[in-house]
From Swiss-Prot:
This is Lys-63-specific deubiquitinase BRCC36. The gene is Brcc3. A motif (JAMM motif) lies at residues 122-135. Keywords: Acetylation, Cell cycle, Cell division, Chromatin regulator, Cytoplasm, Cytoskeleton, DNA damage, DNA repair, Hydrolase, Metal-binding, Metalloprotease, Mitosis, Nucleus, Phosphoprotein, Protease, Ubl conjugation pathway, Zinc. The modification Phosphoserine is found at S233. Pfam families: BRCC36_C (PF18110), JAB (PF01398).
Amino acid sequence: MAVPVVQAVQAVHLESDAFLVCLNHALSTEKEEVMGLCIGELNDDVRSESKFAHAGSDVCTVPEKVDSIRVVHIHSVIILRRSDKRKDRVEISPEQLSAASTEAERLAELTGRPMRVVGWYHSHPHITVWPSHVDVRTQAMYQMMDQGFVGLIFSCFIEDKNTKTGRVLYTCFQSVQAQKSSDYERIEIPVHVVPHVTIGKVCLESAVELPKILCQEEQDAYRRIHSLTHLDSVTKIHNGSVFTKNLCSQMSAVSGPLLQWLEDRLEQNQQHLRELQREKEELMAELRSLE
C-alpha cells in the first residue's frame, strides 16, 4: 500500500507583476540560466466544504469539513547577480540569501506584513520545464531550512513543433523523499497567477535593476579575463570587442524594450490622470449647480 505524500505547501499564488519580472529576467538571455529569489508570505488559508440541511421551512448551511491549506503568496522577486555563468545550472550563495532576508525584513517593516524569502526561481533556456536531479537536490537542501520553500522554473526559447511559434512554460515544485530510496523526487505545486491592475513599486524597482545587473555580470567576466597576464595584445583587443558587442546586444534586447515599456506605461498613467481630472471637474460643476 502506497504511503500518501504529505505536502508542506498546497498552492502558490504568484502576483502578476512579480510574474512579469521573472519572465523578463528569464527572456534576457538564452545562453545561460538565470536565477532569483521570491519574497512573500506563507499563510494557512481556510478551506471549508459545506452541505445544506433542512429544518422545517428553513434551509441552513451546516459545515461538513473545515481544514486549512498552506499557500505561498509571492509578492515580489529579487534578481540575483551571477558570479559564474553556466548554461545548465545556477548557484545561490549564502551571502545572497542573507541579503535577500535583509531586504524581506525591510519590506515587512514597510508593508506591516510578515514578508520573508519563500522560494527561488531560475530559467531553463531551450530545455524542458521539469527540474533536473540537481534542481531537485538543491530544492531539498532549501527545504531543510524552511519546509515552505518552493521552486519555480521558467522554460523559454522553445518552439512548438506544430505551430512553429515560441512558448514559455513555467512550473512550481518541491522535493520529497523517494520511497525505498535515499534520493529525492519532485512534487508539483499548483501555481496561480494573481492579476494586478498596476505594477508594484518593489517589482518596478526589480525590473529597472535588470539591465544594471546584466551589465555588472559582463563587466565582472571581462575584468576576470582581462586580468590574466599571459594574454597577448590581439587577444585582449578581441575580448574587448566581444565585451562591447555583448553590452550592445543587452541594450538592444533588454534596455531598449524596457525603456519603451516604461514610457508607454507613463503615457497611459498620464492619460488616466487627465481623464480623472476631467471627471473631477465635471462633478465639481454639477455640485456647484446644485447649490
